[in-house]
């Protein structure tokens, strides 16, 4: 399984609404279209971490391809009051919010 981690800023007290928006979004076929197998949302000191797991190592590409879908655009718009780019001056697309993995370990079974 491969993962992407989106990092952004989140308004304090908005985690329940953000979770609701994703619960509704994940109830559609969009996660399947994007290749998302699991989504986890985290917050820490007004930072937002969005971990998505994919079967293949092309999650960032699939997210980029999905951004023209009206449902993707809708959730992006719905999240704007709660989530903002970590660095608005450099953000151009969802790919600009992806953290860079610099270490990976997986136990063998």
Model-predicted segments: where are they?
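An amphipathic, aromatic/His-enriched active-site/gating alpha helix that lines ligand/cofactor pockets
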Residues: 28-37, 55-93
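Short amphipathic alpha-helical segments
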Residues: 10-37
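Short, low-order "capping/linker" segments at domain edges
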Residues: 85-109
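Hydrophobic residues embedded in beta-strands of well-ordered beta-sheets
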Residues: 48-49
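Short beta-strand segments enriched in hydrophobic/aromatic residues
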Residues: 10, 53-55
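Active-site-flanking beta-strand signature of metal-NTP-handling nucleotidyl enzymes
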Residues: 2-9
